[in-house]
């Protein structure tokens, strides 16, 4: 009689559920359609595009200067890193060299962006698996870093601080001193987070051996950044293809060996320490005699003259007017430039037709390649592991949907 009541295998169907787009663990407007066999994930289908604004098409209708703010709105957790890639691409086409002080300021703020991103990711990943204290600590430090953004550019998030040929304005000495003081205090916060999470039994159970990627699989899927380093490859564009002044800076590239969520967490923790190390070196070089000087190229066909000069010189006024009405013209050609953004390799493929607007600007967002592997990473795991895997990918939808 008991056997008759038991359902046969054919009548047990998989069921489909929606995860997001308003789920707090979805990290933005992600919708996952999950096919489950009981608690086990059979298939994951990410539905993207809910934050699509047509950024690449909009850039084609703007001058090179007007295009910069669009890059802040891609990975809006670490905005200046994206501006960096675009400015480097335009500079390569123009064939101009950025002054040394501007390079140091750019690298300093790129590393601040890296810490902003990793702090948010590590602490919200902990929240995804049930720890509520880390986000409170992380946001306290992020607030201080956003104040540094604001003091340099006037904006906490969408800075638009980098310019083709340098940065918009120099850093006041007091700001450099305050960043230096923050760098001295921050490692203690990372150590506190480390003590709270790294040996926590529940955190390890939720992350160890979850979302494992071998190195060959990582290359096949087009992974970059932490996703590749977690699988054992010391691939970091700051070391392997140095840009700006990274070649003269001393820092380590942390790598994992298991390729799971726990290794990726550890790499982000160590990268924050290395970023502080880079920032300290940049600050020392900014204070040194050879770190003084202009923060932008001295070419008024690319960067406008100073206000004082415009009050004295008609030629300077004409340069200013032409720059802000028409913009500068970039020689025809095409170039691909990639930077090591916090999420991975952020690339800009820029095509110029010799006019004052980009003919095409293709954006290579690292999060896009990582999210497309969500089905491969989650298959066979439990439903509860999906949010842990998603957290370890570090997805931001500004850059995925663009």
Swiss-Prot record:
Instruction: State the GO CC annotations.
Output: plasma membrane
Which family does this protein fall into?
Answer: Belongs to the complex I 49 kDa subunit family.
Sorted alphabetically, which Gene3D superfamilies does this protein's record hold? Cytochrome-c3 Hydrogenase, chain B
Major subcellular location class: membrane
What EC number(s) is this enzyme filed under?
7.1.1.-
One GO MF annotation is: quinone binding
PANTHER family documented for this protein: NADH DEHYDROGENASE [UBIQUINONE] IRON-SULFUR PROTEIN 2, MITOCHONDRIAL (PTHR11993:SF10), NADH-UBIQUINONE OXIDOREDUCTASE 49 KDA SUBUNIT (PTHR11993)
Where does this one sit in the cell?
Cell inner membrane
Its UniProt entry gives the catalysed reaction(s) as: a quinone + NADH + 5 H(+)(in) = a quinol + NAD(+) + 4 H(+)(out)
InterPro entries in the record: NADH_Q_OxRdtase_suD, NADH_UbQ_OxRdtase_49kDa_CS, NDH1_su_D/H, NiFe-Hase_large
Q: Which Pfam families match?
A: Complex1_49kDa
**Complexes and interactors:** NDH-1 is composed of 14 different subunits. Subunits NuoB, C, D, E, F, and G constitute the peripheral sector of the complex.
Q: Which topology term describes how it sits in the membrane?
A: Peripheral membrane protein
Please, which domain of life does this record's source organism belong to?
A: Bacteria
On whether NAD is a keyword of this UniProt record, the answer is yes
Keyword Ribosomal protein (UniProt): no
Q: Which UniProt keywords apply?
A: Cell inner membrane, Cell membrane, Membrane, NAD, Quinone, Translocase, Transport, Ubiquinone
According to its UniProt entry, the function of this protein is described as: NDH-1 shuttles electrons from NADH, via FMN and iron-sulfur (Fe-S) centers, to quinones in the respiratory chain. The immediate electron acceptor for the enzyme in this species is believed to be ubiquinone. Couples the redox reaction to proton translocation (for every two electrons transferred, four hydrogen ions are translocated across the cytoplasmic membrane), and thus conserves the redox energy in a proton gradient.
Source organism per entry reads Rhodopseudomonas palustris (strain TIE-1)
| Protein name as catalogued | NADH-quinone oxidoreductase subunit D
